[in-house]
């Protein structure tokens, strides 16, 4: 299948991006952890990918770091968890933070990630605890400048499963000091986990 793509970033709007590889545009869904570090549109990018085929759809997911792709795949092995929740995990916490939450059994923090309830968090801890030490992240998080960071962050938070009013409040609170889109989103998600 498709394991990696190298091309020009043609489009990015969370959670979607398009990479032009030899004139073919590959549409991928990606977690916010990937969006934080993406280059500007028109620049070269290399993404690790996960190809998923269901009865009625085909999906391609993109990750800047191999550790994120590995975590995405491992989280989906937990009973009752699919791609949407796996993306929410990677959008809500770093790979290292997730490993710490699993190792320590922090159910409360896990339930703050959209789509994860108490029972799902407990299942995750039980089923992933042995593999948590193998999770590895990569480079530090950086962002992209945007003309309206709060507006873009609100849209991104809605795509992650937050209700419109809640997403707007989170983005407003996190963006009070201004800053890049990725910074506003990261601050909002970190505040939600507290």
UniProtKB/Swiss-Prot annotation:
Residues 65-140 are annotated as: Domain II. Residues 145-194 are annotated as: Domain III. GO terms for molecular function: ATP binding; four-way junction DNA binding; four-way junction helicase activity. Residues 140-144 are annotated as: Flexible linker. Coiled coil: none annotated. The RuvA-RuvB-RuvC complex processes Holliday junction (HJ) DNA during genetic recombination and DNA repair, while the RuvA-RuvB complex plays an important role in the rescue of blocked DNA replication forks via replication fork reversal (RFR). RuvA specifically binds to HJ cruciform DNA, conferring on it an open structure. The RuvB hexamer acts as an ATP-dependent pump, pulling dsDNA into and through the RuvAB complex. HJ branch migration allows RuvC to scan DNA until it finds its consensus sequence, where it cleaves and resolves the cruciform DNA. Belongs to the RuvA family. Homotetramer. Forms an RuvA(8)-RuvB(12)-Holliday junction (HJ) complex. HJ DNA is sandwiched between 2 RuvA tetramers; dsDNA enters through RuvA and exits via RuvB. An RuvB hexamer assembles on each DNA strand where it exits the tetramer. Each RuvB hexamer is contacted by two RuvA subunits (via domain III) on 2 adjacent RuvB subunits; this complex drives branch migration. In the full resolvosome a probable DNA-RuvA(4)-RuvB(12)-RuvC(2) complex forms which resolves the HJ. This is Holliday junction branch migration complex subunit RuvA. The lineage of its organism: Bacteria, Pseudomonadati, Pseudomonadota, Gammaproteobacteria, Lysobacterales.
